[in-house]
Amino acid sequence: MRMFPLLPLIAVGLFGSGCSSSDTRPLPRPPSVDVPRFMGDWYVIAHIPSRPEREAFDAVESYALRPDGRIQTTFTYRKGSFDAPQKSMHPVGRVEKEGNGAIWGMQFMWPIQAEYVIAWLDESYHQTIVARSKRDYVWYMARTPQVSDSDYQQAVERIAAMGYDLSLIHI
């Protein structure tokens, strides 16, 4: 039995479902993102996870610019606990023409592409918030595995101002 016709339906179930908000305001975003500077490792500090990430611990998102201009992503995590073996996912990102580098499409499997908006990025490229217009998933990430309490609180306030339900955030 061929499974390929079912893959798009499975992808919608995995990535398209979630608790979305009725907030329809456009997400904020920086005036521009220097995509090559954005590349590298980002530690997930807090997030409202997608279905595959719900049991992710010790998560790191790594980006590398490919020769074709797309972004090779490696999401490493430990499923279920900090002691679990490391697992990874390998979606490919594409920077959209509009958005000055802040709007990407992230493809986990063809032809499904998820919205990926860099909604906030500090000037030093050390902290970021990646969001979706549906307000169903959000990621607060930093270049280091820990941030100060003040930075964390400011990020949570930014996420709330975007219209997210803070009770869904995982730390």
Each model region followed by its residue ranges:
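A beta-rich soluble binding module of mature secreted/lumenal proteins
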Residues: 13, 18-169
